[in-house]
A protein has these predicted regions:
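Metal-dependent amide/peptide-bond hydrolase catalytic core
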Residues: 2-11, 65, 97, 181-186, ...
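Acidic/His- and Gly-rich active-site-bordering loop/insert found
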Residues: 2-117, 138, 142-143, 340
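Short glycine-aspartate micro-motif
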Residues: 86-88, 114, 174-178, 200, ...
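Short beta-strand segments
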Residues: 90-91, 150-152, 177-180, 202-204, ...
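Glycine/serine-rich anion-binding loops at beta->alpha junctions
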Residues: 97, 113-127, 209
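Acidic/histidine-rich catalytic neighborhood of metal-dependent amide-processing enzymes
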Residues: 122-192, 236, 387
């Protein structure tokens, strides 16, 4: 559709409100291909389903193989000039759901609701990207900042393989839009995310017979109990600092003083300064029981996504464009991490642009069609925006 001017927000919204059937078609084609993170062999089919849609839109698609994951997909405009600024749409096509989930949790359309494994987190976000790009083509709009897309297959297990690609791309981007689900049924955008640290505490004690000579032993379990109390004392809920000992293991038999014990700890913070301070506190814990020793390993695999000046700027842009669409957008802090935590270290990042719905990682996972089409309209307008100052 040729136009002499850029379409108004109302034109874009009206067009996308007519794309309900296309949204359902695209989403069903992806959800029916199950793609659990821990089954890399399942990822190739879903990647091809998605790649075909981008190629149909004229994008050059690069399939990046993975060693321990199902690989990645990078799509870009072939006519992008060397050195020209780009904007990245970021997402993942892996899900937490095991093979066979569709047998008892099928893809289902019920009025304005779509249910199924991965519809909300986050195959619906990939559909939004496609709908937004289709909309730009429909109105014959050429964005001044070239759009690119990166999708990985290991986000749900920490992006250990794809993280370096994401960092390398983010450095060269004017901005990044993360198509993870929005926050809550009111659809808040995620302008901050907590950083996530993972630490493993290993205690070594001395085995002894629990009845004949307990004094000759040094209980690794007793020592671990002291460490756990020290760890929980680091919680500061007012600041949003959470320290959780999620798993513990140890001992040989009931009648043996435990020579070994171990705990795995999840830590979440809102700022880089808090991450550094709490890391130092955890690593400085000393054993309290004579005859025991401690080894604590760990780090923050996802740094906090903070409300930096660049992130505030892109939020203000989204808020203004949302108002043009008649949307009253709100922002929020997410307790979980995403690949947006990584890109935020390098460039302006706006997260939670994906579907409006509920039930990520839960059996009631669903999205709202009408609200998700509105988010596709918002993404369309963001893609057309000028380069950030």
């Amino acid at each position: 559709m040729k136009m002499d001017r850029h379409p108004a927000a109302s034109d874009i919204l009206q067009h996308l409100q007519g794309q309900r059937d296309e949204l359902i078609r695209l989403l069903e084609s992806m959800v029916r291909v199950e793609s659990p993170s821990d089954e890399p062999g399942t990822q190739h089919e879903i990647r091809e389903v998605i790649a075909a849609e981008f190629e149909q839109l004229g994008f050059r698609v690069h399939r990046i193989p993975g060693r321990n994951s199902g690989g990645m997909l990078y799509a870009s405009y072939p006519e992008r000039a060397r050195g020209a600024k780009a904007q990245l749409m970021l997402g993942h096509y892996d899900t937490v759901w095991p093979l066979g989930t569709l047998d008892n949790m099928p893809f289902e359309v019920d009025g304005d609701i779509i249910r199924g494994p991965g519809v909300y987190d986050m195959k619906g976000g990939i559909v939004q990207v496609l709908l937004a790009l289709q909309t730009l083509r429909y109105f014959d709009i050429k964005p001044k900042v070239y759009p690119a897309i990166f999708l990985n297959s290991d986000e749900e297990i920490g992006s250990r393989e794809s993280g370096r690609y994401i960092s390398a791309l983010a450095v060269h981007m004017d901005r990044v839009f993360v198509l993870e689900p929005s926050l809550g049924l009111d659809g808040r955008l995620k302008t901050a995310r907590k950083g996530i640290g993972r630490f493993t505490v290993t205690v070594t004690g001395e085995a002894a017979h629990a009845g004949l000579d307990p004094g000759a032993g040094a209980s690794a379990i007793l020592e671990l109990s002291h460490v756990i109390q020290s760890l929980f004392a680091l919680n500061d809920f007012d600041k949003g600092i959470t320290v959780n000992v999620g798993t513990i293991d140890g001992g040989l038999r009931p009648n043996v003083v435990a020579p070994k014990s171990q705990a795995v700890v999840d830590v979440r913070v809102s700022t880089q300064a808090e991450a550094e301070a709490i890391t130092a506190s955890i690593l400085s814990i000393e054993p309290a029981i004579p005859g025991t020793s401690l080894n604590i390993d760990g780090y923050f695999g996802r740094q906090p996504m903070e409300r930096t000046p660049a992130n505030r700027q892109i939020w203000q842009l989204a808020h203004r464009l949302g108002a043009e669409l008649g949307l009253e957008l709100e922002q929020g802090l997410a307790g979980g991490g995403s690949d947006g935590n990584t890109t935020s270290l390098y460039t302006a990042t706006l997260d939670g642009l994906g579907p409006v719905g509920d039930g990520a990682h839960a059996r009631h996972e669903h999205l709202l069609i009408s609200k998700t089409l509105e988010r596709a309209a918002l993404l369309s307008m963001l893609l057309v925006a000028d380069k950030l100052e």
